[in-house]
């Protein structure tokens, strides 16, 4: 039983490591492409124009913070805030993707350097739902297997 528990804990640590790196890359790319971030958010047609500059200023730092906190949560007691921030961001991104798909928008996902220019599809939605599921699994493991 201990071997299975250890394997699950290693798996969830890898999930946090990979998601942390994903957020760092995505947020970092938004810092590098700051001019296009506002347009990318505007493409989703969900945020009032008056709020676009605020969202633009907050998005990259929020993603980088989520990435840093997820990585630090492997060693420091910052898991709760890391989880809430990461889950919240992915949830908002997933809602945006779902809304765009329902409305038939063919727009770039704005996912960062790795998927720059990638047009959202149902696969984008499934990917985001998988990320949410992995975070939910990680939370379950943290609440049940660790003291």
Regions found by a protein language model. Give the residues of each.
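Membrane-interfacial helix-loop segments of redox and metal-homeostasis proteins
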Residues: 1-147
